[in-house]
């Protein structure tokens, strides 16, 4: 087996060539569509009429969709201003989850997996919720999203991803039956190699090991031999939605989930991927800040079923489920209520956004949020502003050093309206904050993969964990308390009236921000 350095040298050119091939292939096909449309326009006014009719019909179709209004308006404006370009881009990339084969497979698999959630949902036990508000928030996730709440579970919060990785490796070492790992990005470098060696050692002892990664998320980090390399070490590995040089409307929907499950008894999730910068082994954007949680107990069942959602949807045969849901004896130390949940772009339920909205609307004292990207719907903006205007201490932490400069400009374009309503905005001065966490009133918290942006809330496959009634909620709050002193508060800077040119540019950015 090649060492890590050699693997890394191969990964970069290999990935660049794959991206270039895919990009050139897609670009040529898009240009061909434009050329064909323009040539047809030259020969017949009937084509122009057809284009106008199609523009009108597609616009009506978009307007009638049960999706966020800002998302609809951005597409409608683009199509009306540039009909051929707008129609082409929308038909290729704007229809979330439009591929019928994947929609059917995912839907069938999800329906099958719901049967394993059903017994927990039907029990409706009197779980130890701190108050009526948290009970209602859990009820939404159970009744509308189909994910049950669990007790008899301990939650450990990690504000330091190095600690999270060490805990994860310890859990992997203890595996006796199976290991499931699903990540948006895996980098074949030192952090992953430490994990891979443990996986290979466990596989050699008869443990079933599955690794699932998103092809776009990992394309700059691993080479095309990665799957074969893992197979040679006894590890099952699959890519989600592989990049191909052919137009594919599903290519815009990525697997952004981060899950590890060991034997159905221990699970991990959070914002961090298995790449070097997440553990500050490299520093492309200054200090990297992320977070995660460890679950032990009954709620790991929910995390296991979430992993099987996409793993099962990428195969034709129905996945085996029962043997991955063992009845593991466990007695929790705390009376927590824990609810792992997921979101996907193939239905009309904006689960991730609704959980955040519920927490913000119900907050009485404070709600604190971290997100790497801040691209908000009108409803989310109104909810944040209303909470702040009603006396709730609303604070949002975003990066101080961006990984994407255009998206950072879009993020900042939302500051002014929020700051003027009393929302306090902080930028993480040491570098890039990638954590996706929210805590409200010291009673409930969410840690997971879901950013406050349109891609996370509407286009990607995501997961998170909501929990209450345990010390981990206070740990999340303490993490915020440690963050604020190292952040730069920019509230007043953006609350003050700025120049007309700056305000105009912000409007342009926000107009098309849902498409970014």
What are these regions (language model features)?
Residues 1-354, 358, 362, 402, ...:
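N-terminal localization/anchoring segments of enzymes in phospholipid and broader phosphate metabolism
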Residues 382, 408-412:
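Short glycine/threonine-rich loop-to-helix capping motif typified by GTGT followed
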Residues 425-429:
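Active-site donor-binding acidic/aromatic loop of nucleotide-activated sugar
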Residues 184, 372-373, 407:
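Glycine- and other small-residue-rich loops at beta-strand/loop junctions that grip anionic moieties
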Residues 436:
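Catalytic-core elements of nucleic-acid end-processing and repair enzymes
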Residues 363, 373-395, 399, 404:
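Helical hairpin unit composed of two closely spaced alpha helices linked by a short loop
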Residues 290, 370-371:
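A short, conserved beta-strand element enriched in hydrophobic/aromatic residues
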């Amino acid at each position: 087996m090649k060492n890590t350095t050699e693997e890394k040298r191969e990964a970069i050119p290999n990935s660049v060539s794959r991206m270039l091939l895919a990009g050139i292939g897609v670009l040529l096909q898009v240009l061909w569509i434009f050329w064909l449309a323009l040539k047809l326009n030259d020969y017949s006014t009937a084509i122009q009429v057809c284009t106008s009719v199609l523009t009108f019909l597609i616009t009506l179709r978009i307007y009638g969709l049960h999706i966020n209004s800002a998302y609809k308006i951005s597409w409608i404006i683009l199509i009306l201003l540039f009909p051929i370009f707008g129609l082409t881009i929308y038909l290729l990339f704007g229809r979330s989850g439009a591929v019928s084969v994947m929609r059917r497979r995912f839907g069938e698999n999800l329906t099958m997996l719901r049967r394993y959630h059903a017994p927990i949902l039907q029990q409706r036990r009197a779980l130890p919720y701190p108050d009526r508000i948290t009970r209602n928030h859990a009820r939404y996730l159970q009744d509308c999203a189909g994910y049950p709440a669990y007790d008899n579970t301990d939650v450990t919060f990690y504000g330091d991803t190095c600690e999270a990785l060490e805990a994860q490796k310890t859990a992997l070492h203890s595996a006796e039956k199976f290991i499931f790992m699903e990540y948006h990005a895996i980098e074949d470098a030192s952090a992953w190699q430490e994990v891979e060696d443990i996986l290979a050692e466990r596989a050699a002892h008869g443990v079933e090991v599955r690794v699932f990664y998103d092809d776009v998320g990992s394309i700059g980090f691993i080479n095309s031999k990665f799957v074969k390399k893992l197979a040679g070490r006894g590890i099952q590995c699959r890519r989600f939605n592989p990049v191909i040089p052919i137009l594919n409307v599903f290519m815009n929907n990525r697997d952004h989930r981060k899950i590890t499950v060991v034997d159905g008894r221990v699970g991990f999730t959070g914002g961090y991927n298995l790449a070097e910068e997440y553990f500050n082994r490299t520093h492309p954007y200054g200090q990297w800040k992320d977070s995660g949680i460890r679950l032990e107990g009954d709620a790991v069942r929910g995390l296991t079923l979430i992993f099987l959602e996409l793993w099962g949807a990428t195969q034709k045969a129905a996945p085996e489920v029962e043997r991955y849901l063992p009845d593991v004896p466990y007695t929790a130390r705390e009376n927590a209520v824990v609810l792992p949940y997921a979101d996907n772009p193939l239905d009309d339920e904006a689960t991730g956004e609704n959980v955040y909205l519920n927490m913000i609307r119900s907050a009485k004292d404070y709600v604190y949020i971290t997100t790497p990207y801040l691209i908000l719907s009108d409803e989310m903006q109104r909810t944040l502003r209303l909470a702040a205007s009603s006396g709730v201490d609303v604070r949002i932490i975003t990066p101080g050093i961006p990984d994407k400069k255009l998206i950072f400009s879009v993020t900042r374009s939302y500051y002014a309206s929020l700051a003027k309503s009393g929302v306090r905005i902080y930028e993480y001065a040491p570098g890039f904050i990638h954590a996706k966490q929210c805590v409200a009133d010291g009673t409930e918290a969410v840690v997971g993969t879901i950013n406050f942006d349109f891609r996370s809330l509407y286009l990607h496959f995501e997961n998170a964990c909501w929990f209450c009634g345990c010390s981990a909620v206070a740990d999340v709050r303490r993490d915020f308390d440690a963050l604020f002193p190292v952040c730069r508060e920019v509230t007043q800077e953006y609350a003050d009236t700025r120049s007309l040119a700056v305000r105009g540019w912000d409007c342009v950015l926000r107009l098309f921000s849902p498409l970014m």
